[in-house]
């Protein structure tokens, strides 16, 4: 018989840097999960993606065991890395902060494809371009 799920926890944690301090500790402590066990496993799984923020979905079962699924980094994080900026524009309509080439947008869209509900890479590119626009990043051919 399948184990009964008692809680789902969604977090965004820097790759390879999970530790029991907030936000990880309190979120998992409430669910009764072995926090150090999660941190070690998460850090081992994401050590190759250092510098990126990784969304993770943790499923906690009745016997306090857990499984987790790591997702692809948010489009905004990938765009900031591609553009070489620390943050997006405070006024995206007025102030543009960077430019990104369309082939870089395609690369980001292909990376994000498993987590997006897009039928094609072109549709995923449009989603990424929308994120870029809202951050004040200009897309050029």
From Swiss-Prot:
The keyword RNA-binding is assigned to this record: yes
Stored InterPro entries: Ribosomal_uL11, Ribosomal_uL11_bac-typ, Ribosomal_uL11_C, Ribosomal_uL11_C_sf, Ribosomal_uL11_CS, Ribosomal_uL11_N, Ribosomal_uL11_N_sf
Matching SUPFAM superfamilies: Ribosomal L11/L12e N-terminal domain (SSF54747), Ribosomal protein L11, C-terminal domain (SSF46906)
One annotated GO molecular function: structural constituent of ribosome
Post-translational modification, as annotated: One or more lysine residues are methylated.
GO biological process: translation
SMART domains for the chain: RL11
The entry's keywords: Methylation, Ribonucleoprotein, Ribosomal protein, RNA-binding, rRNA-binding
Similarity comment: Belongs to the universal ribosomal protein uL11 family.
Quaternary context: Part of the ribosomal stalk of the 50S ribosomal subunit. Interacts with L10 and the large rRNA to form the base of the stalk. L10 forms an elongated spine to which L12 dimers bind in a sequential fashion forming a multimeric L10(L12)X complex.
PANTHER family: 60S RIBOSOMAL PROTEIN L12, LARGE RIBOSOMAL SUBUNIT PROTEIN UL11M
Function: Forms part of the ribosomal stalk which helps the ribosome interact with GTP-bound translation factors.
Alphabetical list of HAMAP family matching this protein: Ribosomal_uL11 (MF_00736)
Name listed for the protein in its UniProt record: Large ribosomal subunit protein uL11
Species annotation: Shouchella clausii (strain KSM-K16) (Alkalihalobacillus clausii)
Organism ancestry: Bacteria, Bacillati, Bacillota, Bacilli, Bacillales
């Amino acid at each position: 018989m399948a184990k009964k799920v008692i809680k789902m926890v969604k977090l965004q944690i820097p790759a390879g840097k999970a530790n029991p301090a907030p936000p990880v500790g309190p979120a998992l402590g409430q669910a009764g999960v072995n926090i150090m066990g999660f941190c070690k496993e998460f850090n081992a799984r994401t050590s190759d993606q250092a510098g990126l923020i990784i969304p993770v979905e943790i499923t906690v079962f009745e016997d306090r065991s857990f499984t987790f699924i790591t997702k692809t980094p948010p489009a905004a994080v990938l765009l900031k890395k591609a553009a070489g900026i620390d943050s997006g524009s405070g006024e995206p309509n007025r102030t543009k902060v960077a430019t990104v080439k369309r082939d870089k947008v395609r690369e980001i869209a292909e990376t994000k494809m498993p987590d997006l509900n897009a039928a094609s890479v072109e549709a995923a590119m449009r989603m990424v371009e929308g994120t870029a626009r809202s951050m004040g990043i200009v897309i050029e051919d």
